[in-house]
């Protein structure tokens, strides 16, 4: 994979951090779709399908006071992201976006879909699995697909299928079709707590982050002493969920569990100074947390100041 735009260790960018406390978030300008950072010897590339503004109608547990303080304009920056990782001689994809745009972004980096060795899915919502199956064919023909056991079990459950109204069963069927397409190279894993998460491949650990879906996970990357936590949909509305982690979204399958996972993992990455990347974090999709005086967090976006 060719490093594109930016190569820099997440903790060694001198004078390049743009501090952005989301309380004061502004509307986003048009952004590039790809940018690359370094984590040890790993190269981590954002593959973004676009930036957008989210609304308060999906927020759960957000009081008028919270909204007025965190997002007074009534909306917040969001995005749809996947991440490509070059780890030694392996090319790894973390989440697969909405569709073919993910592959187009990879090609902008000089990487073909056939070169991807493994695809790690945080959960099986449509904006994370869209390029896995395109026109009935595997989007990544040589890749092993990694999915957590609780997520796999949920989508393969006949009881779950039977309990859904007819007009909602298509989503389950679509996910099953993906699992079937990759059945010869399907790795179903059991994640663990972030303190001792199991290693799936060298430098890639699977972290339980349940709540958004029954088997939602994050992936902790480590190379040469540097770390990055890819947390999937642990957050959707950074502007309000950082200062107020107790705010959830309407499409969390288990609100209480999602809040519990978010609070625990935010504390861990903040205490251990681990940079993070997220599927719905605005460009460039990565940053780090600091604790604020109100028992919440401030978020610092990674800087693109070394972009070429």
Regions found by a protein language model. Give the residues of each.
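N-terminal secretory signal peptides that target proteins for export/translocation
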Residues: 1-10
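Bacterial N-terminal signal peptides
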Residues: 13-25
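Active-site environment of divalent metal-dependent phosphoester hydrolases
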Residues: 32, 53-55, 124-131, 154, ...
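Conserved beta-strand hairpin/beta-sheet module of binuclear metal-dependent hydrolase folds
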Residues: 33-108, 218-234
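Metallo-beta-lactamase
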Residues: 38, 107, 115, 149-208, ...
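Active-site neighborhood of phospho(di)ester-bond hydrolases with catalytic His/Asp-centered motifs
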Residues: 93-97, 118-125, 146-148, 208-211, ...
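Active-site metal-binding motif and surrounding structural segment of the metallo-beta-lactamase
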Residues: 100-146
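Cap/insert and terminal regions of metallo-dependent hydrolase folds
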Residues: 222-308
């Amino acid at each position: 994979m060719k490093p594109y735009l930016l190569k820099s260790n997440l903790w060694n960018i001198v004078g390049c951090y743009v501090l952005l406390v989301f309380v004061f978030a502004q509307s986003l300008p048009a952004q590039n779709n790809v940018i690359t950072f370094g984590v040890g010897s790993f190269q981590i590339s954002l593959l973004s399908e676009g930036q957008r503004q989210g609304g308060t109608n999906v927020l759960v547990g957000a009081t008028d006071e919270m909204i007025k303080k965190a997002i007074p304009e009534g909306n917040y920056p969001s995005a749809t992201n996947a991440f490509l990782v070059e780890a030694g001689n392996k090319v790894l994809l973390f989440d697969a976006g909405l569709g073919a745009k993910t592959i187009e972004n990879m090609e902008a980096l000089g990487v073909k879909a056939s070169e991807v060795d493994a695809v790690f899915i945080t959960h099986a919502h449509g904006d994370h699995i869209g390029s896995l199956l395109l026109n009935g064919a595997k989007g990544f023909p040589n890749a092993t697909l990694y999915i957590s056991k609780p997520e796999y079990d949920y989508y393969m459950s006949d009881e779950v299928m039977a309990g859904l109204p007819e007009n909602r069963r298509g989503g389950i069927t679509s996910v099953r079709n993906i699992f079937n397409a990759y059945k010869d190279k399907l790795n179903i894993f059991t994640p663990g707590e972030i303190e001792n998460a199991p290693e799936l491949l060298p430098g890639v650990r699977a972290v339980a982050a349940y709540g958004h879906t029954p088997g939602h996970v994050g992936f902790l990357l480590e190379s040469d002493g540097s770390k990055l936590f890819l947390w999937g949909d642990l957050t959707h509305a950074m502007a309000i969920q950082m200062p107020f982690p107790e705010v959830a979204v309407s499409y969390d399958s288990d609100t209480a569990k999602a809040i519990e996972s978010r609070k625990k993992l935010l504390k861990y990455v903040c205490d251990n100074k681990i940079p993070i990347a997220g599927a719905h974090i605005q460009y460039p999709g990565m940053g780090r947390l600091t604790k604020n005086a109100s028992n919440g967090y401030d978020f610092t976006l990674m800087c693109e100041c070394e972009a070429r």
